[in-house]
């Protein structure tokens, strides 16, 4: 079978392939090879720019332009050529080195220094920087923009429904009212914290040889300050430098990055489930789309499929991300190869998350508050005013306020008239009685509206 969306084993590349297209140029085999080529070329250019490395003279402008073009115009055909070479070498990074030697063979100035391609490097020098560039690109260009869309979409709901009262539920039972907007603001605030934290994760890299001590570098050029050279090179790629490593960059930052993504995903699962529940309670209605079918046998169904799809894919995403976060920082002695196959799945966890983000955004776009139902539900739960009444009774020293309200309301339905009669019988100042009698389940919402307005 030819590989296609119909024959792909993973639904990430199959059924949902169109939803993860933004990740293909980053996390695919092509993407990894593209970043490896970039690192190898920039390393050669860095060597040529150092006066003490006389065997690699400073490149002429044409040679620099030629090397830059190899990086900028790296194509699928180039990637395919590397894979062809790899069939002989059985070593993926060495195949990149040989590919570059082929590319520079026609330029005498570059051909003369071709043995300095991959100079003093271990494969992991190239790989760790390539993975760092992959993750930085994905974070900055894909993940954070999607997070911003989600946060802004939920903030829009908060503002739109800032004053729509909602009967809260704790333990699934009626509780002190809030507003739809305030509940959305709670989620947006949590997400904003994770957004800031993800943006602040230091993406690290190293280029220091087989065990992190520049052994081969110093053997060849003892007069060069390779530690400084390494720092300059890594930071020139837009990556933070890690000066202390074994053969591998220890991947702690990947754990930090993915733990943060998993936390955001968990917050989104919480949101998906809450909205699913609000739809089930008829608090939200869903806009219907012509032609869509909710059930193969029940024609009336309008299911919350977007939030269900999101929840399921977020679970898969977190399973992958959390495994990566716990596995990658552990490597035997100066390195073992267990991280290699795991690192090839960086895009899988992000891919499932991306599918989920788009599903939630679609679901949010179809939500409409069922205002009449919300008000009706509040009107059938006057017992929630037991809280403010007993609290005011405490202020004025009335004996056993909690117990009296418990006797009136626990396990019972109390209407507006019953509450007013109870208030009239209390030894309270008349202005306090009037204030309490003006309260309804729909307006007993505390600072909910103000807190939405204060959300940044």
From Swiss-Prot:
**PROSITE patterns found in the cross-reference section:** FUMARATE_LYASES
Catalytic site: 171, 295
Q: Which GO terms describe its cellular component?
A: cytosol
Q: Which residues carry this modification: N6-acetyllysine?
A: 94, 366
InterPro entries per UniProt: Fumarase/histidase_N (IPR024083), Fumarate_lyase_CS (IPR020557), Fumarate_lyase_fam (IPR000362), Fumarate_lyase_N (IPR022761), L-Aspartase-like (IPR008948), Pur_lyase (IPR004769), PurB_bact (IPR047136), PurB_C (IPR013539)
Q: What is its EC number?
A: 4.3.2.2
Effect of changing residue 171 to A/N: reported as: Reduces catalytic activity about 500-fold
- Residues that coordinate or bind AMP: 15-16, 90-92, 247, 309, 335, 340-344
GO MF, one term, reads: guanosine tetraphosphate binding
Q: Where does fumarate bind?
A: 91, 122-123, 247, 296, 301-303
Q: How does it assemble?
A: Homotetramer. Residues from neighboring subunits contribute catalytic and substrate-binding residues to each active site.
Function, as annotated: Catalyzes two reactions in de novo purine nucleotide biosynthesis. Catalyzes the breakdown of 5-aminoimidazole- (N-succinylocarboxamide) ribotide (SAICAR or 2-[5-amino-1-(5-phospho-beta-D-ribosyl)imidazole-4-carboxamido]succinate) to 5-aminoimidazole-4-carboxamide ribotide (AICAR or 5-amino-1-(5-phospho-beta-D-ribosyl)imidazole-4-carboxamide) and fumarate, and of adenylosuccinate (ADS or N(6)-(1,2-dicarboxyethyl)-AMP) to adenosine monophosphate (AMP) and fumarate.
State the protein's name: Adenylosuccinate lyase
What gene, per UniProt, encodes this protein? purB
């Amino acid at each position: 079978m030819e590989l296609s969306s119909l024959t792909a084993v993973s639904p990430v590349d199959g059924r949902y392939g169109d939803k993860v297209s933004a990740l293909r140029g980053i996390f695919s085999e092509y993407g990894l090879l593209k970043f490896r080529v970039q690192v190898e070329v920039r390393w050669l250019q860095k060597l040529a720019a150092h006066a003490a490395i006389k065997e690699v003279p400073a490149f002429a402008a044409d040679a620099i332009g030629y090397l830059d073009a190899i990086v900028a115009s790296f194509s699928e055909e180039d990637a395919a050529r590397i894979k062809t070479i790899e069939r002989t070498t059985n070593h993926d990074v060495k195949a990149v080195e040989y590919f570059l030697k082929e590319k520079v063979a026609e330029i005498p100035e570059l051909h003369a220094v071709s043995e300095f391609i991959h100079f003093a490097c271990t494969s992991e020098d190239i790989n760790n920087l390539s993975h760092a560039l992959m993750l930085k690109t994905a974070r900055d260009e894909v993940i954070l923009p999607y997070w911003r869309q989600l946060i802004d979409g939920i903030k829009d709901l908060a503002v739109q429904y800032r004053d729509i009262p909602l009967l809260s539920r704790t333990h699934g039972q009626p509780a002190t009212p809030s507003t739809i907007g305030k509940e959305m603001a709670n989620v947006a605030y949590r997400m904003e914290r994770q957004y800031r934290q993800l943006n602040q994760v230091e993406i690290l890299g190293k280029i220091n040889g087989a065990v992190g001590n520049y052994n081969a570098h110093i053997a060849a050029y003892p007069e060069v300050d390779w530690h400084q050279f390494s720092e300059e090179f890594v930071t020139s790629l837009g990556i933070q430098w890690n000066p202390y490593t074994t053969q591998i960059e220890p991947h702690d930052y990947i754990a930090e990055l993915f733990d943060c993504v998993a936390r955001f995903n968990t917050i989104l699962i919480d949101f998906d489930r809450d909205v699913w529940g609000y739809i089930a309670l008829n608090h939200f209605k869903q806009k219907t789309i012509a032609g869509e079918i909710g059930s193969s046998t029940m024609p009336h169904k309008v299911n919350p499929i977007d939030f269900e799809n999101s929840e399921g894919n977020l679970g898969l995403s977190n399973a992958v991300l959390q495994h990566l976060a716990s596995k990658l920082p552990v490597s035997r002695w100066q390195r073992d190869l267990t991280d290699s196959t795991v690192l090839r799945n960086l895009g899988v966890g992000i891919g499932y998350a991306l599918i989920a983000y788009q599903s939630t955004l679609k679901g949010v776009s179809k939500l409409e508050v069922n205002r009449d139902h919300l008000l009706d539900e509040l009107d059938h739960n006057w017992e929630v005013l037991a809280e403010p009444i007993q609290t005011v009774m405490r202020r004025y020293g009335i004996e056993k306020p909690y117990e009296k309200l418990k006797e009136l309301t626990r396990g019972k339905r109390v209407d507006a008239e019953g509450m007013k009669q109870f208030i009239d019988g209390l030894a309270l100042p008349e202005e306090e009685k009037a204030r309490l009698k003006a309260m309804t389940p729909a307006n007993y919402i505390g600072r909910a509206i103000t807190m939405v307005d204060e959300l940044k």
